[in-house]
Structures are given as structure tokens and as C-alpha cells.
Regions:
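Short acidic-hydrophobic, aromatic-tinged amphipathic segments that line or gate anion-handling sites
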Residues: 168
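Substrate-binding cleft/loops of secretory-pathway carbohydrate-active enzymes
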Residues: 1-29, 80-91
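Glycine- and acidic/polar-rich repeat regions and solenoidal domains
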Residues: 16, 21-53
Length: 189
């Protein structure tokens, strides 16, 4: 109700997805307002259900798409497990333990790139390259600015970065052959 009212929405800077979430069974956990119950009391009365990567991504990306001028954070159930979903959905402050300074500098300058598949999500920037979170073994044609790139793999659980190809020349696009699910970083050099 607040975000649909332009006057009140103007004072909202951050959308915090905390007290509701999509469930893996396709339903929504959303306690009714005005019941004078704390979130823990609602959780005793209504089954909370589980939220997976896909559900976290959906929530963040929907709000970022609908309200592009607002920061979106997710602190719902098991939020530390959904850092990649928050990042790939365009959210702010994802909980990720990637210890690569170049990655941490590049990612905030990237934007969500809409794709017509659930096989992967992508964020990219002309000067930074692209990050893809891939869920299926497949070949992906990634549109990129012409230049030199390093192809890196980031383990989604440990956030360890490993170099697959250190120096590759790209002209307009790169064909990424996915040999294992996870996060691929095409780092512009």
C-alpha cells in the first residue's frame, strides 16, 4: 500500500524483504497485517515453508523491476544462503564471501540483463564484463563489448575464484561452454 501511493513511496529508499517470501511450493508466506502479532508469533500459527534460490531471486528481481530507483535487500528466511539470488536479481547488500577485490569493484557497476530462460541469470557492464549464475550444463552466447577477458569460475558455496582462461579476445560475444553449474565471471581486462 505504501509503495503504490506516490506521496508515501517518495520517502522510501530501501525495500526490505523480511517478513514475507515465496515458498518452494509456489505459495506465498505473508502474515496478515494488523493482527498485533510479532513475526515469531505468526510463524507459530502459519507454516512458514521453505524459500529456495529461485524464490529469493524472483522476489528481489520483481521489486527491482517495479521500483528501479529503490534499493532492495532480502533478509527473509535463511537470507545468508541466498546471496547469489540477491546479487543476480539486482538487489543490494548480498551476503557473499568473494575475496577478489576486482570482482567486488566490478559488480556494483553491473546491471541485470534480462534473459528468456531459467538456465541462468546474468548481470553485466560494458567496462566490467559479465557474471552468470548457471543452473544447467549448456552453451551460452554472452554478449560482450569487444576486448580482452579472463574467464573465471566462482564456487557458489565457498566463493573461491579460479581462472579457467586467463586471456581471451572477444568480438561482440563469447561462447561459454558450461561444464559445471555455478557462477562464471567474464572479467574485462
Amino acid at each position: 500500500a505504501i509503495l503504490s501511493d506516490p506521496k508515501r513511496a517518495a520517502v522510501v529508499d530501501i525495500i526490505d524483504i523480511r517478513y514475507w517470501h515465496y515458498r518452494t511450493d509456489g505459495t506465498v508466506y505473508a502474515p496478515e497485517g494488523g493482527k498485533n502479532l510479532a513475526p515469531r508469533q505468526h510463524a507459530r500459527k502459519i507454516k512458514v515453508g521453505k524459500m529456495g534460490y529461485r524464490e529469493a531471486y524472483k522476489a528481489v528481481s520483481e521489486y527491482r523491476t517495479k521500483y528501479p530507483d529503490k534499493a532492495v535487500v532480502l533478509y527473509a528466511q535463511n537470507y545468508p544462503d541466498h546471496g547469489w539470488a540477491v546479487l543476480m536479481g539486482g538487489g543490494s547488500c548480498p551476503v557473499l564471501q568473494v575475496a577478489d577485490d576486482a570482482f567486488l569493484a566490478a559488480v556494483p557497476l553491473m546491471d541485470v540483463v534480462p534473459v528468456d530462460t531459467e538456465d541462468y541469470e546474468m548481470i553485466a557492464g560494458k567496462k566490467q564484463g559479465a557474471v552468470l549464475n548457471v543452473h544447467r550444463l549448456t552453451d551460452i552466447t554472452v554478449p560482450l563489448s569487444s576486448g580482452k577477458y579472463a574467464v573465471k569460475y566462482i564456487d557458489p558455496q565457498t566463493c573461491k575464484v579460479s581462472v579457467l582462461v586467463d586471456n581471451v579476445k572477444v568480438k561482440d560475444s563469447f561462447r561459454l561452454t558450461v561444464k559445471k553449474e555455478g557462477v562464471y565471471w567474464l572479467q574485462r581486462k
